[in-house]
């Protein structure tokens, strides 16, 4: 209807600040029209994995060091509300997700030297609205991680969308990769 035209300037203005700002502006507009925004996972709980490991391979000691380094890096970037993904290999940050997204980050992370070594940690940004904007992992992410030479993917409990769950688990098992969901106790 024509009422939507009224809001276009606000959305265009928000677009200059990025996709998170667009979503926040849309949520404000909906609230002004007495429409409540619900968490999308409330209606699709099958899209999340609960805490734990989802493949036969589990993170080893080096993987856990890489995971901790990645989490520390994401926390330090949190003040800038900049990135939701980081790749760490041998306790060194290899790449940080930027405007190009996860695919671009994983392309930059490719290693001919290392195979099945290193991790992708993908957490929401500090100011991300988790009702409508969650990090998403799917089969393509796993394939790109494998191509980059990574061993595993880590997401945060109840703060992600996981597509094609069984295909991803089967792919991880076949390629000796891990998929792990961590919870608050692990983070600190």
Describe the predicted segments one by one:
Residues 143-188:
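C-terminal binding/interaction regions
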Residues 1-7, 16-20, 31-146, 155, ...:
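Conserved mixed alpha/beta catalytic, RNA-binding, or beta-rich assembly cores of soluble enzyme
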Residues 1-4, 27, 164-169:
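Short Gly/Thr/Asp-enriched flexible loops that form oxyanion-binding sites at enzyme active sites
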Residues 10:
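Charged, glycine-enriched surface loops/patches
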């Amino acid at each position: 209807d024509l009422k939507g035209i009224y809001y276009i300037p606000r959305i265009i203005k928000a677009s200059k600040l990025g996709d998170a700002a667009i979503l926040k502006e849309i949520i404000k507009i909906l609230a002004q029209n007495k429409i409540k925004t619900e968490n999308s996972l409330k209606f699709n709980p099958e899209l999340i994995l609960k805490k734990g490991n989802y493949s036969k391979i589990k993170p080893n000691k080096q993987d856990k060091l890489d995971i901790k380094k990645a989490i520390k890096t994401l926390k330090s970037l949190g003040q800038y509300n900049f990135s939701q993904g980081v790749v760490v290999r041998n306790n060194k940050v290899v790449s940080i997700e930027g405007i190009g997204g996860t695919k671009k980050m994983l392309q930059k992370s490719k290693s001919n030297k290392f195979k099945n070594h290193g991790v992708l940690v993908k957490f929401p940004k500090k100011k991300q609205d988790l009702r409508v904007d969650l990090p998403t992992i799917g089969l393509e992410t796993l394939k790109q991680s494998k191509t980059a030479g990574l061993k595993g993917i880590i997401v945060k409990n109840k703060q992600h969308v996981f597509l094609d769950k069984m295909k991803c688990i089967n792919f991880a098992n076949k390629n000796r990769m891990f998929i792990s969901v961590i919870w608050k106790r692990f983070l600190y």
